[in-house]
Amino acid sequence: MSREGRRRTLRVLVVDDSAASRDELVRLLHGGDGLVVAGTAADGEQGLAEALRLEPDVVVLDLQMPRMDGFTFLRLLMARRPTPVVVLSSRSRRADVFKALELGALDFVARPERGGLAPVREELLEKCATVRALRIQNLSAGARALDARELEPARVAVVGASTGGPSALQRLLAALPGELPLAVLVAQHMPERFTGAFAERLARGSHFSVVEAVDGDLVVAGRALVAPGGHHLELARGADGVLRAAVLPPGAPGPGARHCPSIDRLFRSAARMLGRRACAALLTGMGTDGRDGIAAVKAAGGLTLAESEETAVVYGMPQAAAETGAVDALLGLDALTARLVEFARDARAP
């Protein structure tokens, strides 16, 4: 038999949020150099489920996607079923490429600055085909259908802020290590139509994947979900028992709240869903939002932190919470962040 005849077919999974890009990749890859496209996915969450179901030989991955981005996908895939991944990346986002390689990607292909992907077809085929030369054993051993409950992080931080919050949150999220076994949910008092851009700004300076929350988003380590302006954000479990974000309209049933998003509602939901696995952190802001919610987290056995007058732009909310006696530690912003990291890393933390 010829060498060509002995060459095994490689099954490819394409993960890209653009339908046009997915279609083009299928056309370019399918049948080329012994490759067949076994499936496609529109975001990281769907891609992870398909990778575990289809057990492809190689994944072609876009990094910038909604819901679950490529970085979170890589972390979870390499933990569950290590698979060769070829990243498609914009030339203007070189740092993203190196981050992806650090997370386990095999190689990358730079997208053409204009036009379609045809100019890089041969490069894509070649880099996917290099999988044949890799010494990767037992990739499918133990692989099984995705149970999203297995992705639930060991610790979850719920963070509330108002006046002065954008800068404080940017500083806090920038200091969190990317491999921390922690998910973060944020309620920042901010009008509608601003929180999407705010999440993008936070993401640019953070090792975490930071996105505006969408109802039903998985809560996973290395990811921060920002409450959409004009909506409440809570933690909830469906009938399947999976921990997800619930995005609720202003009039949704529940304790009355002056602000939307409500810090109290987010904190109370963390107390109900997580108990001692939750940390509530109340940052700078005016008023009393978060005061009752932080007391609920304390009563459920979670860790409660508030920003001290030393660094808070407005000390109103942290002070109101501290006066209830429900705050475990009143700390400057950097010390508060360090305590949060310690909490995430210590499985025995309260």
Curated annotation (Swiss-Prot):
GO terms for cellular component: cytoplasm. It is found in: Cytoplasm. One of its GO terms (biological process) is chemotaxis. Phosphorylated by CheA. Phosphorylation of the N-terminal regulatory domain activates the methylesterase activity. Residues 11-126 form the Response regulatory domain. GO terms for molecular function: phosphorelay response regulator activity; protein-glutamate methylesterase activity; protein-glutamine glutaminase activity. It catalyses: [protein]-L-glutamate 5-O-methyl ester + H2O = L-glutamyl-[protein] + methanol + H(+); L-glutaminyl-[protein] + H2O = L-glutamyl-[protein] + NH4(+). The active site is at 162, 189, 289. Its main location: cytoplasm. Its EC number is 3.1.1.61, 3.5.1.44. InterPro entries: CheB-like, CheB_C, CheY-like_superfamily, Sig_transdc_resp-reg_Me-estase, Sig_transdc_resp-reg_receiver. PROSITE patterns: CHEB, RESPONSE_REGULATORY. The modification 4-aspartylphosphate is found at residue 62. Keywords: Chemotaxis, Cytoplasm, Hydrolase, Phosphoprotein. Residues 150-347 form the CheB-type methylesterase domain. Gene3D superfamilies: 3.40.50.2300, Methylesterase CheB, C-terminal domain. Belongs to the CheB family. NCBIfam families: PRK00742.1. Involved in chemotaxis. Part of a chemotaxis signal transduction system that modulates chemotaxis in response to various stimuli. Catalyzes the demethylation of specific methylglutamate residues introduced into the chemoreceptors (methyl-accepting chemotaxis proteins or MCP) by CheR. Also mediates the irreversible deamidation of specific glutamine residues to glutamic acid. Contains a C-terminal catalytic domain, and an N-terminal region which modulates catalytic activity. This is Protein-glutamate methylesterase/protein-glutamine glutaminase 6. The gene is cheB6.
